[in-house]
Amino acid sequence: GYCGEFVSSTLENDLEMIDTNVRAVHILTKLFLKDFVSKNSGRILNVASIAGFMPGPMMATYYATKNYVTSLSRAVSYELKEMGSAVTVTAFCPGPVNTEFNQVAGVSFATASIESKTAARMAITDALNGKRVSIPTFKMKLVRFGARLVPDCLLLKICSNIQQKKIN
């Protein structure tokens, strides 16, 4: 993910991110879901982010793609439940996880990140248990809750300030 002003990112990088985070998730969810529904068995685990619940100044494309994954997963999960299907879709929405993401985006996180193995275990456990949304830490659950309460103009400012600190 690129960290900086939207106007400064390259269209090529934006489209690569959209292809990876949106198109690939959409295609794979659609293809696997048809088979799973016909067998009335299966689990889909889509990797989103806590960013999927917020706007993301300075990482606009990344946040937008994660919003897509979160929204798609939640909506399809609801549809499956309404159909009476045993198939589930889980949106895994962690905060910072120790991966190479930081180096790729050229950022450092101000908040502690969780180990990738810990995140993976939590995601798989929640998916197997049929959870619609999986948020692995209490702190990130508070972030999601807080994002619902804060007016959009303030949330945009907060998110922008957090991203600015990553690149400064």
Briefly describe each language-model feature range.
Residues 56-60:
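Active-site loop immediately N-terminal to the catalytic Tyr-X3-Lys motif
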Residues 29, 65:
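Active-site helix of classical SDR
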Residues 5-18:
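Substrate-binding pocket helix/loop in short-chain dehydrogenase/reductase
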Residues 49:
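Residue(s) in the substrate-gating loop at a strand-loop-helix junction
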Residues 94-104, 109:
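Short, flexible catalytic-loop segment of classical short-chain dehydrogenase/reductase
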Residues 91, 108-144:
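C-terminal helical subdomain
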Residues 35, 54, 75-87:
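Active-site-adjacent segment of SDR/Rossmann-fold oxidoreductases
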